Amino acid sequence: MPSPRVLGLVLAGGAGRRLAPLTADRAKPAVPFGGLYRLIDFVLSNLVNAGYLRIAVLTQYKSHSLDRHITTTWRMSNLLGNYVTPVPAQQRLGPRWFAGSADAIHQSLNLVYDDAPDIVVVFGADHVYRMDPRQMVAQHLDSGAGVTVAGLRVPRSEGRAFGVIQTAPDGRTIEAFLEKPADPPGLPGSPEETFASMGNYVFSTDVLIDALRKDAADEDSVHDMGGNIIPMLVAQRAAAVYDFAGNVVPGTTVRDRGYWRDVGTVDSYFEAQMDLCALDPVFNLYNREWPILTSIPSLPPAKFVHDGLQRTGTAVNSIVSNGVIISGGTVRSSVLSPGVRVSSWAEVDHTVLMDNVLVGRGAVVRDAILDKNVHVPAGAQVGVDKDRDRARGYTVSEQGITVVGKGVTIAD
């Protein structure tokens, strides 16, 4: 049987308000992660590693940095007809923006008609995980379903925070799609677990087009993939679930198999970054068999400067990117993006520093996220006194993480 023709559609229009101020000037999928990456690099790496090389990224809010990253990083071979391209709202159906995720695809159906795929893979743009989507596509073709929804096994007590999939006794046919239910249904054979929707879908093309047209004609719809399109197909008994726990990615360890994180809040974003710094992180960035791909800035290697025991540049349990200079300062359990400088006697602890942050002499940064080009003057502190951080206008999360937006100079 010949391989199906697959088109990837990545939904990247989210505003990411819960990640503010990190999303003040960028779309959520463009938020940096892990030192070198952007959140969108994870889904694009999964699709490209699987050989799916025709991908449209549907964008909307504050998309400039996202568009620039995609066009400069994700360049495919035009000779072979491959592409990864950002597609902003085109207003093809009238003078309006996307009204929801389903409307974004409906307004972009010309992409589907032009490519003429057998299968359309619709994935979200802002989760951290590895996945081989070929296995999900294979199950979809074998099952004969109109849509297959990726399901993540979570404890029933956690299912209240997700859209939840209720299956038939066969464990595969979807009987109901429930939005944040008070009493999530258990799984056949595993009653204390439930399927949370990962927001990843595989559609047979004709089924997708028909569902989008019907949804567009429904004046009561909010035009959402999870809220409208999937329930429509569930009612037609045309929806199946794909158990993400069975997805085997080359090179994965026992610990990171099945890893998937929604980093839509400051605290979940920070926690996922800190996991990378652990002695034995759950998510392994260093899997060469299924790499997370991105563009690497042309900067020199990281440098650690010391001139004796009184002034020693050190970094422990940390990710240190190229172009970083730790000049006599101390870094612990932190993620440092390219171009960061930590000056003499400064302390950086349990912190994320994005590109070109400057930490001055004797400064202290703790339990914080500093966006690009932030300047911490000599002797200044951030993240040490949360009440003072709030008084200075900085965001402090529920779990006490101080977030400072782009280009800010920390006040004394």
From Swiss-Prot:
Record key words, sorted: ATP-binding, Carbohydrate metabolism, Glycogen biosynthesis, Glycogen metabolism, Nucleotide-binding, Nucleotidyltransferase, Transferase
Annotated GO biological process: glycogen biosynthetic process
Superkingdom in the source lineage: Bacteria
First-level EC class: transferase
GO MF annotation terms: ATP binding; glucose-1-phosphate adenylyltransferase activity
CDD domains given in the database record: ADP_Glucose_PP (cd02508), LbH_G1P_AT_C (cd04651)
Stated family: Belongs to the bacterial/plant glucose-1-phosphate adenylyltransferase family.
Function: Involved in the biosynthesis of ADP-glucose, a building block required for the elongation reactions to produce glycogen. Catalyzes the reaction between ATP and alpha-D-glucose 1-phosphate (G1P) to produce pyrophosphate and ADP-Glc.
Assembly and oligomerization: Homotetramer.
Name this protein carries in UniProt: Glucose-1-phosphate adenylyltransferase
UniProt source species: Frankia casuarinae (strain DSM 45818 / CECT 9043 / HFP020203 / CcI3)
